[in-house]
From Swiss-Prot:
Protein name: Adenylosuccinate synthetase
Domain of life, source organism: Bacteria
GO CC, one annotated term: cytoplasm
Gene name of this polypeptide: purA
Binding partners and assembly: Homodimer.
Major localisation: cytoplasm
Entry annotation: catalytic residues: D13, H41
Enzymatic reactions: IMP + L-aspartate + GTP = N(6)-(1,2-dicarboxyethyl)-AMP + GDP + phosphate + 2 H(+)
InterPro entries: Adenylosuccin_syn_GTP-bd, Adenylosuccin_syn_Lys_AS, Adenylosuccinate_synth_dom1, Adenylosuccinate_synth_dom2, Adenylosuccinate_synth_dom3, Adenylosuccinate_synthetase, P-loop_NTPase
CDD domains named among the record's database cross-references: AdSS
Length: 429
């Protein structure tokens, strides 16, 4: 019985929410292992929509859900999201939700710093959600973060906050901002401590025990591999590692526990925020994809940039994340197009290349090299078997498999979880 890592293979927004929900019914434990509440996803169950950005998707199924140490946790958002789910009739208790005691916290100073940097006229605009994710990770690697476990030790919390503010207040002075008092942060933390502490645990131990007992573990990735801090389109990336390897480091369960990596892949390409996007379409086709695909961010509401499927970046992600198979989503959005293009390579300074270069300058200069395939007039929406798909749609899917070097394990044809074609069960050894 394999444990499964779900990772976005593009720039996020690939439709991971539905696939994770589909898989969570087969899983015993669902784990968030990176990111924060900056990337949202929507689950539709029995006609009810659940919008999550921090809590694992398994909660709506009553499965044990874990927030790993690789996640940065905004405690106030945590409480608000828990209460929102309870308001929708979901039972959220420590029996079904655990938070890593060594997870770092996002504080108000992180959110304010994030917004100040992004709103500045100087420097590079990355397109962050301004939710404090980046500054919180900075404090983590700077060894000055306040972690969840620190809330259990009030006697040592003050000196930790003092050390944290020694850094942040120096930044604030340089930006012309008023300094933050220690009492302000202490009050912020103590006001929410009683509401988050019942959920904390040594999640590495919990996961190890469940694995040894034969539980199926699903690792739920956020965002996409092209936003990875190392392997993405740097500096237009997020502040954590989003490739599949982070599932081990961000949960405390060793890499040998990972059995199958499923890459969630949209049948076309989208991106939110700034950064290179070789196949972006600023024309009526781009508008068609955005409108039909409802391409607006769950967290920010920002309109997503849209373009043709880019086999180069997905092929690269297949390698950097060790993807065994992909779940191809939103195929139905392409219904009705007379022809469909796929980017098979790039041209860089007159030369053909089959990879996305690392430098920002080169990424901005690459030009897509396309193959054109005939589209289809029939609908794929709601298809639940290969026989339900138009012949040209099947050819499109098969060609994607050839180009990226990975098979399609699942195919999604609508937001409804039942409209899914299963080719390979990721949980099956």
């Amino acid at each position: 019985m394999a444990n499964v890592v779900v990772v976005g293979s593009q720039w996020g927004d690939e439709g991971k929410g539905k696939i994770v929900d589909w898989l969570s019914e087969r899983a015993d434990v669902i784990v968030r292992y990176q990111g924060g509440h900056n990337a949202g996803h929507t689950l539709v169950i029995d006609g009810v929509s659940y919008k999550l950005s921090l809590l694992p998707s398994g909660l709506v199924r009553g499965k044990l859900s874990v927030i790993g140490n690789g996640v940065v946790v905004d405690p106030h958002h945590f409480v608000a999201e828990v209460e929102k789910l309870r308001g929708q009739g979901i039972d959220v208790t420590p029996d079904v939700l655990r938070v890593a005691e060594n997870a770092p916290l996002i504080l108000s100073i992180h959110r304010e710093l994030d917004a100040m940097r992004e709103g500045s006229n100087s420097g590079l605009k990355i397109g962050t959600t301004k939710r404090g994710i980046g500054p919180a990770y900075e404090d983590k690697v700077g060894r000055r973060a306040i972690r969840v476990i620190d809330l259990t030790e009030p006697e040592t919390l003050r000196p930790k906050v003092e050390r944290l503010l020694a850094h942040h207040n120096s930044l604030r002075r340089g930006m012309g901002l008023e300094e933050i008092a220690v009492e302000t942060i202490l009050t912020e933390l103590t006001s929410v401590a009683d509401q988050i502490l019942p959920y904390i645990d040594q999640v590495w131990r919990v996961l190890d025990e469940r694995r040894k007992a034969g539980a199926r573990i699903l690792f739920e990735g956020a965002q996409g591999a092209l936003l990875d801090n190392d392997h993405g389109t740097y500096p237009f990336v997020t502040s954590s590692n989003t490739v599949a390897g982070q599932a081990a480091a961000g949960s405390g369960l060793g890499p040998t526990a990972i059995g199958y990596v499923l890459g969630i892949t949209k049948a076309y390409t989208t991106r939110v925020g700034e950064g290179p996007f070789p196949t972006e379409l600023n024309d009526e086709i781009g508008e068609f994809l955005g409108t039909k695909g409802h391409e607006f961010g769950v967290v920010t509401g920002r309109k997503r940039r849209c373009g043709w499927f880019d086999a180069v970046i997905v092929r690269q992600t297949v390698r950097t994340s060790g993807i065994n198979g992909i779940a191809l989503t939103k195929l139905d959005v392409l219904d009705g197009l007379e022809e469909i293009k796929i980017c098979v390579a790039y041209e860089l300074d007159g030369k053909r290349i089959d990879y996305l270069p690392s430098s920002m300058g080169a990424q901005a200069r690459v030009k897509p090299i396309y193959e054109t395939l005939p589209g289809w007039s029939e609908t794929t929406a709601g298809a639940r078997s290969w026989n339900d798909l138009p012949a040209q749609a099947v050819k499109y899917v098969r060609h994607i498999e050839e180009l990226i070097g990975a098979p399609v394990a699942m195919l999604s044809t609508s937001p409804e979880r039942e409209d899914t074609i299963l080719v390979t069960d990721p949980f099956h050894d």
